[in-house]
Amino acid sequence: MRTFIDVLRDNAVHSDRSVTFVRAAGEERVVGYPDLWHEAQRRAHAMAAIGLQRGDRVALVLPEPDEFILTFIAALAGGFVAVPIYPPQTLAKMEAYGDTVRHVLAASGANVLITTDALRPMIEEHLVRGASTARVVVERDVRSAAGFEGQSPEPVSLDDVAFLQFTSGSTSSPKGVMVTHRNLSVNSHAIMFDGLQSTPADRGVSWLPLYHDMGLIGFVIAPLYALVQVMFLPTMAFIRRPSLWLDAIHRFRGTITFAPNFAFALATRAVTEGQARSWDLSCMRALGCGAEPIQPDVLRAFLGRFAAQGLRPESILPSYGMAEATLAITFADVTAPLRTDRIDLAAMRAGQARPSSGDGAAMELVSCGRPFPGHELAVMGPGGRPLGERQVGEVWLRGPSVTAGYYGDPAATEETFGGGWLRTGDLAYQADGELFICGRAKDLIILNGKNYYPQDIERIVSRIDGIRDGQCVAFSRFDDAGAEIAVVVAESRRNTAGLAAAIVSAVRGEL
């Protein structure tokens, strides 16, 4: 097995291969594979020149896709450990952003942070305020490598840590997942060849954030590993104007793209007939969905909305994964239409995924497919007891995509990775060998001895007239008497006095 850096070096002979960067201002920059490899070597040389040594952690806060990707690959090529940090999105939340940067720097031990001229003053201010000793270097200085004459860095080992992927921190403080070069090679190969069945004729289109594993591994590392060309769009440009995503697929003749569930809902709602009229989306063969709960109604609405543009039902490709498994764990069949399972809600709350008979409350779940070859997936009950077909339990995984644990946190590593299995914290069941995700174990709401999934409550509330689509959250807390109660927070499009009563009625009526 070769490292990603070995593969990238060998692929540099393909002068007909390139990546395209669309910057925030709209201009496009095309970088061929030979130039990509040369630039990675040059920047790795510059990083060594500023004092970085092999194994040192280096934080990256770079908003533009080309700046980030070229510097990230350079860090891997030089044997440094990259630490991606998302760039600030709004001035209104700078205090919270500063807290995040300081936490990641402290947790990773990074003593160098590379950013832009524009962001440097703000970042330095927050580091001084937090008494951080990290040195801030501008990307421009890494770009201009004095004394570089094309020399290659020392080779990296498969078991070296390539980068730290910090978790989202949705249920705890963000932790740095140690992703090795072996993890990257194994998972990239599985994604591109087992999951996507890709060839060099494929073309990827992505607006996904590059500091997140789906954007970084799924559309930088894996495609470069497999000689697949990619067009990168600025994330915020998609959020402001969703039509840019589908327009890029049309223009670039994209065959592979991925997005979270919310993006499909946003595009369905926001794209106008005038924008879509000239598109031909028949080129798209793998329209992947993951990173958050997948709603089948949203995917069907998206397919229906763009069927006239040639989008095919079998192009929808649900998947499941997490940073602790590098990226991907399961893929649905890339050649088959969407598969769903409608199950009885009462039975599921009792831990059984029984198909609905049509009577009583039910919910529809999406198949996320099967685990990759060479990996073992099991659904476990309490105490690590393997569960059978259609029994709901926690997803456990073992295999070469499972990462090396959390950097500097042996207790959390033992809790999640101990005993040879990755305990994902996700609840699911298997049916006919395929995985159906139900929710997060830590998110379960237990009322009067019954289990309720927040996603079920949120799905019901989102359908109520007056509630903004996707803008609600359900959770539990304990009241003054010590009893667990359910709480729903929802954003309304208008001030409706009876909305709270409507929410209570709808949830009680369906659950």
PLM regions with names:
Residues 17, 148-166, 172-173, 183, ...:
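Conserved pre-ATP/AMP-binding loop-to-beta segment of ANL
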Residues 6-31, 162-164, 171, 321, ...:
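AMP-dependent adenylate-forming
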Residues 285-287, 294-434, 442-444:
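Conserved AMP-binding/adenylate-forming
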Residues 250, 257, 399, 404-405, ...:
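AMP-binding/adenylate-forming catalytic core of the ANL superfamily
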Residues 1-2, 102, 139-161:
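Flexible, low-complexity linker/hinge segments
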Residues 185-203, 213-255, 270-275, 376:
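Conserved AMP-binding/adenylation subdomain of ANL enzymes
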